[in-house]
């Protein structure tokens, strides 16, 4: 049970650090406006699935952001290594967070019911 709390704590710390690294260290214009919404860790802390959103709804911007994040993965891992006190920094996988779009769709459906 205690391991579960550690996994959650490490995930929250990685989320905070990756957001900061994207704002201050990564200069790639493709990742401007990207916000990390969640990080899910494997139980052994070897892999982190990083969920992100981008302000634009355009598919081309989403694809550019994904490519920019994949390109910046090495820089992000290196900075995490400097900032976190962990034996091994987990491998990072970036995934577009669909929950906000889903929430907006549900919101629109509810508004349409009121009409």
UniProtKB/Swiss-Prot annotation:
Main location: cytoplasm
InterPro entries cross-referenced by the UniProt entry: KH_dom-like_a/b, RbfA, RbfA_dom_sf, Ribosome-bd_factorA_CS
Compartments, record wording: Cytoplasm
Pfam families attached to this UniProt entry: RBFA
Keywords, sorted A to Z: Cytoplasm, Ribosome biogenesis
Tagged with keyword Disulfide bond: no
Top-rank taxon, per record: Bacteria
GO terms for biological process, alphabetical: maturation of SSU-rRNA
Membrane-spanning segments: none
Cellular compartments per GO CC: cytosol
Record bears the keyword Transferase: no
MF-aspect GO terms: ribosomal small subunit binding
Family matches, as SUPFAM superfamilies: Ribosome-binding factor A, RbfA
Function: One of several proteins that assist in the late maturation steps of the functional core of the 30S ribosomal subunit. Associates with free 30S ribosomal subunits (but not with 30S subunits that are part of 70S ribosomes or polysomes). Required for efficient processing of 16S rRNA. May interact with the 5'-terminal helix region of 16S rRNA.
Family: Belongs to the RbfA family.
Assembly behavior: Monomer. Binds 30S ribosomal subunits, but not 50S ribosomal subunits or 70S ribosomes.
Protein name: Ribosome-binding factor A
Species: Streptococcus gordonii (strain Challis / ATCC 35105 / BCRC 15272 / CH1 / DL1 / V288)
Species classification: Bacteria, Bacillati, Bacillota, Bacilli, Lactobacillales
């Amino acid at each position: 049970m205690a391991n579960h709390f550690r996994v959650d704590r490490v995930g929250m710390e990685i989320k905070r650090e990756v957001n900061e690294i994207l704002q201050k260290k990564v200069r790639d214009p493709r990742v401007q406006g990207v916000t990390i919404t969640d990080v899910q860790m494997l139980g052994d802390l070897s892999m982190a699935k990083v969920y992100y959103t981008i302000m634009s709804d355009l598919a081309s911007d989403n694809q550019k952001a994904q490519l920019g994040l994949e390109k910046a993965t090495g820089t992000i891992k290196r900075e995490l290594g400097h900032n976190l006190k962990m034996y091994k920094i987990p491998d990072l996988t970036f995934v577009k967070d669909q929950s906000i779009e889903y929430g907006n769709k549900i919101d629109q459906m509810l508004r349409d019911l009121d009409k």
